[in-house]
Amino acid sequence: MVKIYAPASIGNVSVGFDVLGAAVSPVDGTLLGDCVSVEAAAEFSLRNEGRFVSKLPADPKDNIVYQCWDRFCSAIGQRVPVAMTLEKNMPIGSGLGSSACSVVAGLMAMNEYCNRPLNNNELLILMGELEGRVSGSVHFDNVAPCFLGGMQLMLEENDIISQPVPGFNDWLWVMAYPGIKVSTAEARAILPAQYRKEEIIRHGRYLGGFIHACHTQQPLLAAKLMQDVIAEPYRTKLLPGFAQARQAAADIGALACGISGSGPTLFAVCNQPDTANRMADWLSQHYLQNDEGFVHICRLDTAGARKLG
């Protein structure tokens, strides 16, 4: 049997709409991500379990893990009879790369089970394709960090899909999922078709400056540049309490605060454990809307998807 864990990820990381992503894992060792296991069987089957199993499609063929198996078999030219189990620990429509977790774990599990017929680049291309079936467009800002780990900048040139961006060892990422769903398609539809030249210039300055600050290890400059002029101004209306949370983050002393992916999860970057704990407490009391919500203090997950068994 092969079992793969794929971690949660932050799409966009505020400053890099559709081109920047970061994998995260809780500091307390909690597995914030999906697991997929594969074992030999006479015919294909898929079993679902985990905290958020009730949110999965009723028809197994609509399940993205079934589609991963089907597409992987097409890619290698062979129908592989296996029993797959999806452990759905990630809320759907959360802004934590939930579908990417399932896609990455599903495809990597099949590839490991079949003795790696596909290389990492071929796998990543399939992952982007499958993720696009869920979100409506092919983009790699969740699947690349989820698969490869750390923070990744999407390039998609010269057969290079993404490149790693250095993070900061003392940064703690406080992740808060309020317990409500925001559809990625809806969150994309709310964005304008065109932007003003001034906004594009600011976006380029923030993103270029952020990448430079990461490579030159200037954490305060990097945090200052984590500003979103593309999506956040329009998506805040989909996120009850986000404006108050952003203000609280500033008051508490967080370095930056933004929307994770298309929301409703938000993240706050802190460089002191005490600040991170106070931020987590505030979010637990004021940002969560029901008992499905949660708050985790995380670090960048530099390992990415990995075998658990």
Curated annotation (Swiss-Prot):
Family: Belongs to the GHMP kinase family. Homoserine kinase subfamily.
Protein name per Swiss-Prot or TrEMBL: Homoserine kinase
SUPFAM superfamilies the UniProt entry points to: GHMP Kinase, C-terminal domain, Ribosomal protein S5 domain 2-like
E.C. number: 2.7.1.39
One matching Pfam family: GHMP_kinases_N
ATP-binding recorded as keyword: yes
Superkingdom of origin: Bacteria
Major enzyme class: transferase
Gene this protein is translated from: thrB
Species: Erwinia tasmaniensis (strain DSM 17950 / CFBP 7177 / CIP 109463 / NCPPB 4357 / Et1/99)
Alphabetized NCBIfam families for the sequence: PRK01212.1-4, thrB
Role noted for this protein: Catalyzes the ATP-dependent phosphorylation of L-homoserine to L-homoserine phosphate.
Pathway the protein acts in: Amino-acid biosynthesis; L-threonine biosynthesis; L-threonine from L-aspartate: step 4/5
